[in-house]
Amino acid sequence: MIFEIIVRDKKTRARLGKLKTFHGEINTPVFMPVGTQGAVKTLSPEEVEKVGAEIILSNTYHLFLRPGHEIVRKGGGLHKFMGWEKPILTDSGGYQVFSLARLRRIDEDGIYFNSHIDGTRYFYTPELVMEIQKSLGSDIIMPLDICLGYGASYWETKEALEITLRWLKRSIDYKNNSNMDHQLLFGIVQGGFYKELRKEAVERMLNIDLPGLALGGISVGEPKDKMYEIIDYTVSLLPEEKPRYLMGVGAPEDLVVGVSMGIDMFDCVLPTRLARHGVFYTSKGRKNIKNAQYKEDFSPLEEDCDCYTCRKFTKAYIRHLFLQHETFSYRLLTIHNLRFLFRLMENIRKSIREGRLEEFKKEFLTEYLRDDRENRLEKEELWSKLLI
């Protein structure tokens, strides 16, 4: 059994589980930090492990362009290449092709696109994506799919779904004939924000024996309430026995709400990206280290945080470093933001085990959203909906 459910929450769809991979077990629900180029930005693999990561995500598209999957293969695979011994999930790069690449063109065979780096023309196919991920040797792999932005028409979304499903079959065929048994291929449920299409995608995927299912096409410009609505609906259709992966979503409030809806796996660039812009997480919302109020603040970023940053340094010191563009400040903020999310996931798992996830969710959201001054009106509206 690849995925084992240990505890089911009685009041929500949340589950406590273990996902077995070639490079070890993962406790779920789990957050995966993103190491796009084969490294979590500013941190060493040892630091990433110390903050609590059990699995990381790397990007097929970026590693294909640089250094090239053949280089990684010759280096012994991605684990050895980057010095990470725990599980790795690689996404297909489909989202990046649609968001970064120039002059892309899609047909039944694949995607033609120009590299965002130097304009080189490439042809990205389901088979090539599988070949790249075979060379990388990642534990969990994703098929090429078409990810559309919010607002795409019904017929555009339906056509994209049909192609995505056909590409999934081609990906499975390639994997089955390529000595990739140790790699877990998840399916990606697309369908945009049309419930009928999401339902069709799930029903057709249930006829295929996949070890896990991912929700794609989420967090692509839609309002938060619409995002939660489509997540909740789609998860209600998914089989209990398979892990559920919500792609590209990982704000603190999204983790708590997503777990209560039945999501097992999350990834997001937000904690590392925000850190490089001076933003850090606290139990009372996001704060910005550049603010003048921290000039003579000799307290840690978060009083009860056990991370290296909070044990050793003050807001005043980190603010000083950040304003001088010292890269050490990016590292310190990244360590804190990731540890904040991993502590949050630890508390979520503990609350599921103790049968009090709903209470924890209300306590966390009340504290986290109430004092967040950024986008105050939007946050207050979201807060009222989440606590219903």
Swiss-Prot record:
Record region (RNA binding): 248-254, 272-276
InterPro entries linked to this entry: ArchSynthase1/Queuine_TRR, TGT, TGT-like_sf, tRNA_ribo_trans-like
GO cellular component, one term: cytosol
Pathway the protein takes part in: tRNA modification; tRNA-queuosine biosynthesis
Keywords: Glycosyltransferase, Metal-binding, Queuosine biosynthesis, Transferase, tRNA processing, Zinc
Cross-referenced HAMAP family: Q_tRNA_Tgt
Record-given protein name: Queuine tRNA-ribosyltransferase
Source organism of the structure: Dictyoglomus turgidum (strain DSM 6724 / Z-1310)
Chain's gene name: tgt
